[in-house]
């Protein structure tokens, strides 16, 4: 539960920085990832293993996206996704995957609306961190 509190504390600064600077600082993403893992280990080793497997799956998927042409994701998104997947993955790997899916859908809906209103073009970079946080928060609320 303390890891969820830590997530709530860093979610706002992560969102603000990503919206403003299009980056997710290591000083916020790495402690979230490590703190989530340590908290899970202290709470229940079985939960920790489940969360870490979820994290590995999400990180592998996000790394493929970060390395693909055009780099639709940055490495900050990879690290944030890994930390979030540990927390949401406590409730089952499927919930971590739901978190990713909800992130993509919510970000996509927002981007489509912005394109229609001509607030951005297809060439613009979009911060994914806020949508990653929102999608995983929705999955976490549903799972808990």
Task: Name each model feature, range by range.
Residues 4-7:
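N-terminal signal-anchor transmembrane helix
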Residues 10-110:
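Functional transmembrane core segments of multi-pass inner-membrane proteins
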Residues 112-138:
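Interfacial loop-to-transmembrane junctions
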Residues 140-144:
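Juxtamembrane boundary at the C-terminal end of a transmembrane helix
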């Amino acid at each position: 539960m303390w890891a969820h509190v830590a997530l709530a504390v860093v979610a706002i600064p992560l969102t603000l920085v990503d919206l403003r600077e299009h980056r997710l600082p290591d000083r916020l993403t790495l402690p979230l990832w490590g703190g989530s893992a340590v908290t899970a280990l202290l709470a229940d080793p079985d939960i920790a293993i489940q969360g870490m497997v979820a994290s590995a799956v999400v990180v592998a998927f996000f790394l493929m996206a970060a390395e693909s042409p055009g780099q639709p994701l940055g490495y900050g998104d990879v690290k944030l996704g890994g930390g979030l997947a540990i927390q949401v993955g406590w409730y089952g790997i499927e919930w971590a995957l739901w978190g990713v899916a909800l992130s993509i859908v919510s970000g996509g809906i927002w981007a489509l609306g912005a394109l229609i209103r001509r607030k951005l073009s297809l060439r613009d970079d979009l911060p994914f961190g806020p949508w990653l946080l929102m999608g995983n928060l929705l999955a976490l609320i549903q799972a808990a």
